[in-house]
Amino acid sequence: MSSQIRQNYSTEVEAAVNRLVNMHLRASYTYLSLGFYFDRDDVALEGVGHFFRELAEEKREGAERFLKMQNQRGGRALFQDVQKPSQDEWGKTLDAMEAALLLEKSLNQALLDLHALGSARADPHLCDFLENHFLDEEVKLIKKMGDHLTNLRRLATPQAGLGEYLFERLTLKHD
């Protein structure tokens, strides 16, 4: 059944939004895996785990924001299977942060592609939605992860375990 409120909302945009919902849910699932990996007793980097669990929540909220927008525009939310994270063992914080940065860059590219599609389909509402809720936040997160990687690489010495511990205590501290 078609929507009575749908206006200037192309089927290509609708499908791309559904794909982005899935990407955000997959990212949330991956960050949840990362968060609880670093919280294990044999890894014990609580601050790193907290950092990734917060990202899991942010990505889930992003998926919900897209779903609400989809309904407001008269689109239909079509859920797909959420792929499990690529691994269960994440290694050191440096390895995990590199994987997270790649994930965020792929999400950012998907957002940019959706923005370009919205521009091509003359959908100013979609472009405004992306600009106000996603694009700037994504760039800030990529910068933050890049900064964390720079500091983690500085600490990657023969005493890498000590460096990882100090990074976790000094950079990712939380109350």
Swiss-Prot record:
Localization of this protein: Cytoplasmic vesicle, Autophagosome; Cytoplasm; Autolysosome
CDD domains noted in UniProt: Ferritin
One GO term in the molecular function aspect is: iron ion binding
Give GO BP annotations, semicolon-separated.
Answer: intracellular iron ion homeostasis; iron ion transport
Give the InterPro entries listed for this entry.
Ferritin, Ferritin-like, Ferritin-like_diiron, Ferritin-like_SF, Ferritin_CS, Ferritin_DPS_dom
Q: List the keywords (alphabetical).
A: Acetylation, Cytoplasm, Cytoplasmic vesicle, Iron, Iron storage, Lysosome, Metal-binding
Q: What is its main location?
A: cytoplasm
Q: Give the GO cellular component terms, alphabetically.
A: autolysosome; autophagosome; cytoplasm; cytoplasmic vesicle; ferritin complex
Tell me which residues make up the Ferritin-like diiron domain: 7-156
> Residues where N-acetylserine occurs?
2
- Pfam families to which the protein is assigned, alphabetical: Ferritin (PF00210)
Q: Which domain of life is it from?
A: Eukaryota
Where is Fe cation bound in this sequence?
54, 57-58, 61, 64
Q: Does the keyword Iron apply?
A: yes
Q: What is its quaternary makeup?
A: Oligomer of 24 subunits. There are two types of subunits: L (light) chain and H (heavy) chain. The major chain can be light or heavy, depending on the species and tissue type. The functional molecule forms a roughly spherical shell with a diameter of 12 nm and contains a central cavity into which the insoluble mineral iron core is deposited. Interacts with NCOA4.
Q: Which family does it belong to?
A: Belongs to the ferritin family.
Q: What does this protein do?
A: Stores iron in a soluble, non-toxic, readily available form. Important for iron homeostasis. Iron is taken up in the ferrous form and deposited as ferric hydroxides after oxidation. Also plays a role in delivery of iron to cells. Mediates iron uptake in capsule cells of the developing kidney. Delivery to lysosomes by the cargo receptor NCOA4 for autophagic degradation and release or iron.
Name of this chain's protein: Ferritin light chain
Question: Which source organism?
Answer: Canis lupus familiaris (Dog)
